[in-house]
Every structure is written in C-alpha cells, then in structure tokens.
Amino acid sequence: MVKYDAVILGSGVLGLSIANELTLKGLKVAVVGNDLPEDLDSTGFASPWAGANWHSFAINEAERRRDQYTFEQFARLAKEIPHLCERRAYYYLWKGEGAWKEPWYKDVVFGYRMLKPEEVHAPFKYGVTYEAYTLNTPLYLLHLASTLRSARVPILRARLSSLDEAYSLPQLGSVDLVINATGLGARSLLGVEDPTVYPAKGQTVLVRAPVKECYGLVDPLAQPGQKAYIIPRPGPDGYVILGGCYFPNDWSTNVNPEVAEEILKQCHTLCPRLDGKGGKGTWKDIEVISHNVGLRPVREAGLRCEVEERVIGEKVNAGLATKGGKVGGGRKVGVVHAYGIGPAGYQASLGIAKEVGELVDGWMKKSNKKAKL
C-alpha cells in the first residue's frame, strides 16, 4: 500500500488548493470529502456556487497577505488558462457622497481610479473602477481536481463522523497528519466540534447576458446581506452570476423567489445591458439560466489556520472514536486546521494553501518526518 504523508479532509476549493500546494512540495497526500469536485449540483459544500471575483474585504494583515498572494497567482493563471480566470474591469457605483471607503488594495489591482460624473449612469452619482480577476468556479474546481489526479493524488468519497478516523482509513492506511478543510463540517466533526462555525446563506441567479464587466452596488443603507453584484464568468458561454444575499445562520437551501426578483431588479439597475436589449428592456427580459443557493462556511473569529497536536487511540478516545479511529494506545499525531473562511474562499485560497504548506513544513521538521516520495 502507498504510504501517505497527509490526508486532506474536504474537497472544496481550500482542500484542493492545499492538496496541490503540498504535492508541489513533494508530499504524498490524499483528499477525502463527503462531496467531490464533480458534484457541482451539491449544496453540501459552497465551492460550486461561488461567483467568484477577487474583491478583498480583508481587515487585518494576515488576511491581506493571503488575498494579495492569491491575486498574484491568479495573474499567472489568467495568462495560462484564460477560460478559467480572466482579468476584467470592475465598476462599483453609489448614490450618496462618502459611501465608498478607499480600499487597502487600490495599489494591488490595476488602474484604480474614481469615475468621472459623465461615466456614471442614473440613478447613481459616484463610482470607482479598476481591473481584477474573475473565475469560472465549476471549471476551476475540475481543473484543480484534474491537476491532482494527474499527479496521482487520490480524491475519495467518504463520510467521516470523527477526525480520528482520518488517521487510519482502510483505503489509505495510517497517517500522522490530517488537514482539516471541512468547512461547515467542522461544526459537527467529532474531535473538532467548533460551535462558532455557522452558515451564511447566499442566493444567486445564473443568467446569459452580453456583459463583460463586474459591477457592485455600494449602499450603506442596504438591508443586511442585500448588496447587488454582477460577475461574468470566463469562457464562451456568456454566463453571468447575479447576486446577492448574505443570511447568517440560515441553513435553508431553498430558493426564495422574492430574493431572486430583488437580485434581478437591482442588478438591472446596476447594468441595464443585462436585459439583452441594450438597456432598453426591463429586468424581466434577462435570460435566466438557473437559481442557486450555497451555504458559506463562516467562523465567528474568521479563518482558523493553525497546527494542533493530538493523541489518538484506545486509551484516549475509546468512548468516542469509531472503530477506524482506534489505532493503538495513544499515538501522537497532528492536524492543521484550515476552515471558516466564509465568503472569501476563492480570493484567499492560494494564500491559505501557502500558509498551510508552511505550517506542515514546521510540523514535519518538529516531528522529524520526511516526505514519502
């Protein structure tokens, strides 16, 4: 049996990005998830439902570092595989003076500037523009998975009830290191059970429209979770994601028709060309492809990205572990937690993967482990 250095729990964008990072470092890894990258219609994980665009809302240096690193990697991806990642113009519009606060990333993105009055259409009075990146998220997930499989990294479907099981899965054998990228699963996974993890429901509308630019509504008076945005997807299909909403602690995956209608109305106001009639139609003329719901994996304190040393085995957890988790009398192991990123999963993914890679390096050095090349 192949000997693995680590098992990654979670096959969303974080789990797959981390697996790629560790593979590039020469580690033998495997990915295990309830849902696989091909399950693009599953509401069991958030990754397939994202827009996604790079629009950082980092509030501290660690978050800024992750987002900026990912931005730089997206630049490379956009040149190499443009149908996955594309650089395009962004426009953020608002009505009242002072609504926009100058962002930290104004010198990271391309061509940041305030719009002239004649460049802003009614009912808006102010705006800002710059260029950044958007992803075709379903294709990007499949790309990450394909890259891993080409490197002979297994991506397996398994439903684990406890963290301890991951250290001795029948298909993979015994490992001493697990990466916990379980997203919302971190709330219920035995051995983690983080009560501060919760969902933030997002609802979007996938449409087909002749729009190539991203748009966002800046409205300090908007209802919580109700801020319109428009994200064209790279590729030849002409697909555009319209959003959005952000409803904390809402576990429902049902589409709310009233929310969908409000999204279409607000987005048509942001960019009338969505109607396919040069802006001369109404929101009802927008060509709707599908209505979508995803549950963002949020954590009250933000991302948890840290190493935890654990002891597993019959002497420690005989009352909790499943049979697969009982692997001897008190074996010392490690786990790197990487969950709770909320709505910033894609725009921080590669920066988080880099950080996890550094934590793994430190853990292996401390534990006198060598990669199983």
UniProtKB/Swiss-Prot annotation:
Cofactor(s) the protein needs: FAD
Keywords: Disulfide bond, FAD, Flavoprotein, Glycoprotein, Oxidoreductase, Peroxisome, Signal
Gene Ontology CC entries for this record: peroxisomal matrix
Localization in the cell: Peroxisome matrix
Glycosylation sites recorded in the entry for this protein: 180
Reaction catalyzed: a D-alpha-amino acid + O2 + H2O = a 2-oxocarboxylate + H2O2 + NH4(+)
Binding sites annotated in the UniProt record for (R)-lactate: 229, 246, 296
S-S pairs: 214-271
Induction (free text): Expression increases when grown on D-asparagine, D-methionine or D-proline as nitrogen source.
Enzyme class: oxidoreductase
Keyword Transmembrane: no
Residues holding anthranilate 2: 57, 246
Signal peptide: 1-19
Pfam families the UniProt entry points to: DAO (PF01266)
InterPro entries (alphabetical): DAO, FAD-dep_OxRdtase
Binding positions (anthranilate 1): 229, 296
E.C. designation(s): 1.4.3.3
Chain positions of motif Microbody targeting signal: 371-373
GO biological process per UniProt: D-amino acid catabolic process; detoxification
Family: Belongs to the DAMOX/DASOX family.
Purpose of the protein: Catalyzes the oxidative deamination of D-amino acids with broad substrate specificity. Enables the organism to utilize D-amino acids as a source of nutrients. Enables the organism to utilize D-glutamate and D-methionine as a nitrogen source. Protects the organism from the toxicity of D-amino acids, including from D-glutamate. May play a role in its interaction with the host.
Name of this protein: D-amino-acid oxidase 3
Organism per entry: Cryptococcus neoformans var. grubii serotype A (strain H99 / ATCC 208821 / CBS 10515 / FGSC 9487)
Gene behind this protein: DAO3
